[in-house]
Amino acid sequence: MVNFNQFLKQAQSMQKKMQEAQEQMVNARYTGKAGGRLVEITITGRSEVEKVSIDESLLKAEEKEMLEDLIKVAFNDAKQKCDEDSQNSLSGALNGINLPPGFKMPF
């Protein structure tokens, strides 16, 4: 049987580590690139676009469709980096915590 006081201490420790991981994520920045860096998008840990950089060669009417595709690819690249870092941070926060059998985390 799991000692309730021990479980409570582990839960408090886990909560503190998760808060720290979330704070780090808020301050993190992720840059996605597309088209050999013709388009770069930087997002925050909250997936908010912070900066968009577009090479001048793409600012022509005939390049509109390619530019739209590159923006999409660059954003998705940055978002994937953010998601991977978020998952790694939360996994690290839970490292060493012994959860009772059947206990599932909400992520």
Swiss-Prot record:
One of its GO terms (molecular function) is DNA binding. Keywords: Cytoplasm, DNA-binding. It is found in: Cytoplasm, Nucleoid. The keyword Cytoplasm applies. Transmembrane segments: none annotated. Pfam families: YbaB_DNA_bd (PF02575). InterPro entries: YbaB-like_sf, YbaB/EbfC. GO terms for cellular component: bacterial nucleoid; cytosol. Its main location: cytoplasm. NCBIfam families: DNA_YbaB_EbfC. Homodimer. HAMAP family: DNA_YbaB_EbfC. Binds to DNA and alters its conformation. May be involved in regulation of gene expression, nucleoid organization and DNA protection. Belongs to the YbaB/EbfC family. This is Nucleoid-associated protein A1E_05550.
